[in-house]
Amino acid sequence: MKTLLTMELSKKSLEEAKKFLNKYQEAYSKGIDNAVKYATEMMYNKVLEYCYANGISNHTSQIQWQYDDNAKSGRVWTNDMVIIFNEMGTGIVGSNNPHPNPDGPFKSWKYDVNEHGEKGWKYPKEDGTYGWTKGLPSRHMFYSAFQDIKNEIGNIVDIEIRKTVGDLYW
């Protein structure tokens, strides 16, 4: 028995295919944008969780997140030095427990700037008294949150594309 497969092409069928592909491309692009925005917000929430877990929740109001619709990019950041010191670590304790990714903007980070070493130093506390420390280990809340999102990004993208593309998604 002979099997025959035929396919008919016409101007109309090609125009319909083009419409379908354009619709798919727009929906796919929107899904990717939604995934970036959602992942940015998730990372922000994970940073907050790590801050609470490390006992620095009173500084979380200084952590921000933003999604730029024009650039289609998101970011999570802070200018709060307490959070930055906790992220990177300080003193002899920090140099013995450094940040797992000392590259980028913190490549030149110095743990024991004033060379206090084992003797440590006094610092003013919020209640007006002074505390003593040898420094802080790196608690890397931002780095850990980024690693978490990096591990989840495939699922995030898949879900967001399915939401926008729907039945068109393979």
Question: PLM features: residue spans?
Answer:
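Short, Lys/Arg-rich flexible segments
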Residues: 1-83, 100-103, 107, 111-170
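Extended Gly/Ser/Thr-rich low-complexity repeat segments
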Residues: 84-100
